[in-house]
Amino acid sequence: MASAKDIKKSILAPVLDNNPIALQVLGVCSALAVTTKLETAFVMTLAVMFVTALSNLFVSLIRNHMPNSVRIIVQMAIIASLVIVVDQVLKAYLYDISKQLSVFVSLIITNCIVMGRAEAFAMKSAPFPSFIDGIGNGLGYGFVLMTVAFFRELLGSGKLFGVEVLPLVSNGGWYQPNGLMLLAPSAFFLIGFMIWAIRILKPEQVEAKE
């Protein structure tokens, strides 16, 4: 049974020490696409966390009964089933957000973070640590998404979670929204800035020169 210290490490390490986006540069496409609003970024975070945690759990449970030759196919079948569940739940209860997220919910199937943790961790670990690892990597993914979405929504529309925070010129205020922040390139540069800032704080993450 994993100790409380191991659980804490598994949950917190992917946030800064081994972030799937900032360090491993995985899952960047969705990070560019769904971060125009905090609302969509938050829902995407929950979706990826749900799929990663449960796919890790199920893969770990059957890892000793899975032929090596078909393990990738089995992993993808598990992940695809979970993504279908998420997609249907969003369409049933959060239809507007589901429309905004568009195809990116379905593309969780191809998210390198989900497949990577199933193959690299769940195939070699017990079910509970695998489940916790999935939650931790979902949080690490969400940390980047929420940070990027915070600046994009605030500077791009003057709002947070759809609520006006900066007085807009159109409403007699002083802030003119920066439309550039709502375009995908702004997310690319914000993620790049985050990677730079994290590696300033943690120089051990800088790749060694060849």
Swiss-Prot record:
Domain of life (superkingdom): Bacteria
Self-association and partners: Composed of six subunits; NqrA, NqrB, NqrC, NqrD, NqrE and NqrF.
Main function: NQR complex catalyzes the reduction of ubiquinone-1 to ubiquinol by two successive reactions, coupled with the transport of Na(+) ions from the cytoplasm to the periplasm. NqrA to NqrE are probably involved in the second step, the conversion of ubisemiquinone to ubiquinol.
GO MF terms held by the record: oxidoreductase activity, acting on NAD(P)H, quinone or similar compound as acceptor
Predominant localisation class: membrane
Name of the protein: Na(+)-translocating NADH-quinone reductase subunit D
Sorted UniProt keywords: Cell inner membrane, Cell membrane, Ion transport, Membrane, NAD, Sodium, Sodium transport, Translocase, Transmembrane, Transmembrane helix, Transport, Ubiquinone
Topology relative to the membrane: Multi-pass membrane protein
Family statement drawn from the similarity comment of this UniProt entry: Belongs to the NqrDE/RnfAE family.
An annotated GO BP: sodium ion transport
Subcellular location: Cell inner membrane
Enzyme Commission number, as recorded: 7.2.1.1
PANTHER family (UniProt xref): ELECTRON TRANSPORT COMPLEX PROTEIN RNFE, NA(+)-TRANSLOCATING NADH-QUINONE REDUCTASE SUBUNIT D
Catalytic activity: a ubiquinone + n Na(+)(in) + NADH + H(+) = a ubiquinol + n Na(+)(out) + NAD(+)
Species per Swiss-Prot/TrEMBL record: Aliivibrio fischeri (strain ATCC 700601 / ES114) (Vibrio fischeri)
Alphabetical list of Pfam families matching this protein: Rnf-Nqr
EC top class named in words: translocase
Segments crossing the lipid bilayer: 42-62, 72-92, 103-123, 131-151, 178-198
GO cellular component terms, semicolon-separated: plasma membrane
Keyword DNA damage: no
